[in-house]
Amino acid sequence: MSTTAGWSATRNKNLKLGCEAINGIVLMPGETFSFNKIVGATTKDKGYDTGHGYLEGEVAEVIGGGICQVASTLYVACVEADLQIVERYMHAYMPSYMGASTDATIFYPYLDYKFKNNTDRPIKVEAIASGAKVTCKILSVDTRDYYVKFETVIVKNIPWKTVYKEYPPDNEEGYTDGQVISKSSPYSSVESKSYRNKYSKETNKLISSKLENHETYDSRDKVVVKIVDPN
């Protein structure tokens, strides 16, 4: 499983550090993987730098920005390895590098991503970052007669709106009529479902379909100044 997001040297550095932290981890049957326990806080002391992330509902430069791409890529790899997901949280807004309802957000120490090795054999995590691309695999002996695809259905797409915010002509901010003051690009609200679909290796026909997630991403409207004279 591979994902690619917007390029920046500092964000790519964070991807590399995140992948290095989890790469090579081996889980015996019954053991649980915790992203926060293994990666920990993404601090400057560990070499993490700034990258795009969310801060108070807006895209901002944050230390460790991009680490969620590593968690999200690993999440899909785990589902397609048919592993048990123990803990996972969606982003407030649908990330551009993932399909709807297939992402996993990390916010240390509060929001974690965990999965369990519910197989009868050891598994190994492989995670590699190359520039803005992250590739994650779950390695093990595969004796199954089926394969899994993590597939998404968009239920509803609600377009973002233009919201006008009123200011007087002599406003302290110095805003002018028609000025766009939202800090980030607008996002539409998306309601989506994702399924853990099993297919026969022999016939490629669908064997079973299990709902993995049903959720709605927030919208982020475009905010425009409207100058209104109070007199």
Residue ranges and their predicted role:
Residues 1-231:
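Well-ordered beta-sheet/strand-loop patches within structured domains
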